Regions:
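C-terminal boundary and immediately downstream tail of ABC-type ATPase nucleotide-binding domains
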Residues: 120, 203-210, 216-233
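Conserved ABC ATPase signature
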Residues: 128-132, 136
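ABC ATPase C-loop
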Residues: 145-146
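Catalytic Walker B motif of ABC-type/P-loop ATPase nucleotide-binding domains
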Residues: 153-157
């Protein structure tokens, strides 16, 4: 599905990513965990063609993404929810979704399917998105990314600033997408927010991959203590 191999990226003369490698299989949830500024978001942006990488290879379904314009990446079946819930705040929930559906032949059918996944959004279909709660806005951002019916979904800190009840709803949505065979690569700073949904966790520190394990291995308290003591999360 997704292969990232020896990814290297510089900003000016500063190395941001240092030979990052990992694989993501169909229906798998992989979390990049690390503190702010570790390089996690740069990995997502590199996949989306928003940041150039100096060396390395990115493959999606055996197709090379390196050098592909960001405009064409979503057309290959890759959805992206950036940090900050970038919505059209002056538009309604429905209008935000319809923008995401503009290029879809079966837009109404897709919209109905998405709204059935997010009952809260269905209840607020005519509400101005800027008046939604933070959790509801995150749901809408996720729902809009699903308008292209992606095979791969990139999520940048999807639980940031959310109440526990909303975090639970976002996790349930991720698990439902996983059941449908969607692969998910997500970025988080808080380990407790993602362990219930992640199959694998990779810790990124100073642009390097320093640790990886299955979520079951990561739940081991001794392992957590060792890793957290090392990177200071």
């Amino acid at each position: 599905m997704l292969v990232v191999h020896n990814l290297v990226s510089y900003y000016a003369n500063i190395k941001i990513l240092n030979e990052i490698s990992f694989n993501l299989n169909q229906g798998q949830v992989l979390c990049l965990l690390g503190r702010n500024g570790a390089g996690k978001t740069t990995i997502l942006k590199s996949i989306m063609g928003l940041v150039d990488h100096t060396n390395g290879l990115i493959l999606f379904n055996d197709e090379k993404l390196s050098g592909v314009s960001a405009h064409f990446i979503p057309k290959k079946g890759i959805g992206y929810v950036p940090q900050g819930r970038r919505l059209f705040s002056e538009l309604t929930v429905e209008e935000n979704l319809e923008i995401g559906l503009l290029t879809r032949k079966k837009g109404e059918k897709t919209k109905e399917k998405i709204l059935n996944m997010f009952p809260k959004l269905k209840e607020r279909i005519n509400q101005i998105s800027g008046t939604l709660s933070g959790g509801e806005q995150q749901m809408l951002a996720l729902a809009r990314a699903l308008c292209i019916e992606p095979n791969l979904l990139l999520l940048d800190e999807p639980t940031e600033g959310l109440q526990p009840s909303m975090i639970s709803l976002i996790r349930n949505s991720i698990l439902e997408l996983k059941k449908q065979g969607v692969s998910i690569l997500l970025v988080e700073q808080r380990v407790e927010a993602i362990l219930p949904v992640a199959d694998e966790v990779i810790i990124i520190e100073n642009g390097s991959k320093i640790f990886s394990a299955s979520s079951k291995e990561f739940k081991n308290k001794a392992t957590l203590k060792k890793i957290y003591g090392f990177i200071g999360l």
